[in-house]
Regions:
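Membrane-helix boundary elements
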Residues: 1-46
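Membrane-embedded alpha-helical transmembrane segments of multi-pass integral membrane proteins
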Residues: 37, 67-70, 95-98
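Membrane-interface helix-boundary motifs at transmembrane edges
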Residues: 47-54
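A generic, lipid-embedded transmembrane alpha helix
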Residues: 59-75
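Alpha-helical transmembrane segments and their membrane-interface exit regions
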Residues: 63-64, 88-98
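Non-cytosolic membrane-interface motifs at loop->transmembrane helix junctions
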Residues: 77-91
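C-terminal halves and exits of single transmembrane alpha-helices
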Residues: 93-114
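Short, highly charged, low-complexity non-transmembrane loops/tails of multi-pass membrane proteins
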Residues: 109-129
Length: 129
């Protein structure tokens, strides 16, 4: 029993060390991944794509956010408390919120996005001379 616990502990330590050593590469991959797929969810909702397509996209985002939160938690485990360790989970929460909204109430999200687009466009037209 002690050998199994020791082996699992060693593997966990190695995974955490790998995560911290390759932080720039991991964040450099996961942040754009989540950003692009969350934006794609918004595009799918506005274009009224099939719910299955939106759900598949959301599942990919949930996986990416989970990996990002696990990566950030390795920094919390060693006591590193910096701005990125708080911004990345907040960014992940926004991505999850967008995708939850897009999968559970796409009509509401579509109305909001169209309202936002019209509001921004009207302000821009008023600002021109």
């Amino acid at each position: 029993m002690n050998i199994t616990v020791s082996l699992l502990s060693n593997v966990f330590d190695q995974l955490c060390e790998f995560s911290r050593c390759h932080c720039i590469a991991i964040c450099g991959g996961l942040v754009p991944f989540n950003l692009i797929l969350s934006f794609l969810t918004l595009v799918y909702v506005v274009r009224q794509a099939s719910p299955g397509l939106i759900q598949k996209n959301a599942i990919a985002v949930y996986g990416g956010v989970t990996l990002m939160v696990l990566h950030v938690s390795t920094w919390f485990l060693v006591g590193v408390v910096m701005i990125p360790t708080f911004l990345l989970p907040a960014f992940g929460a926004v991505c999850v919120a967008i995708n939850l909204w897009g999968t559970h109430s796409p009509d509401s999200l579509r109305r909001f996005l169209l309202w936002l687009y019209r509001t921004v466009l009207k302000r821009r037209e008023r600002a021109t001379i």
